[in-house]
Regions:
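Amphipathic alpha-helical assembly/interaction segments
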Residues: 1-110
Length: 110
């Protein structure tokens, strides 16, 4: 983790690490949810990170609209991730307390 990373990028990296740890656990996410849910969660976290890194590289003065669109994409991906977390809780793959913590990590990124 670089010292000059924006706080939101650091939070997105922490979210990705946490999400990969949870969804890679076969006891928590059995094989039947591997492709339908856990892979989607992992990919969505990587997408969030990518969009934030991309937005950080866009010049805010010359390409303000593109930067705003990229940040909006990241926020939309966070919304999708929140839906996957809720689904995980409803399927009893994670506890309410775990989902609450995970949701707070997503909120830190938004």
């Amino acid at each position: 983790m670089a010292d000059n990373d924006l706080k939101v990028i650091v939070k997105a990296k922490e979210l990705t690490f946490h999400s990969f740890n949870l969804t890679s656990n076969c006891d928590r996410y059995p094989k039947k949810y591997r492709h339908s849910l856990s892979d989607k969660i992992q990919i969505k976290c990587l997408d969030i990170q990518y969009e934030l890194l991309k937005a950080n590289r866009i010049n805010n003065v010359t390409n303000k609209q593109l930067r705003c669109e990229t940040i909006t994409n990241a926020i939309t991906y966070c919304d999708q991730l929140l839906n996957y977390i809720e689904l995980s809780m409803r399927l009893k793959l994670v506890t309410g307390k775990s989902a609450e913590y995970w949701t707070s990590m997503v909120s830190d990124v938004i």
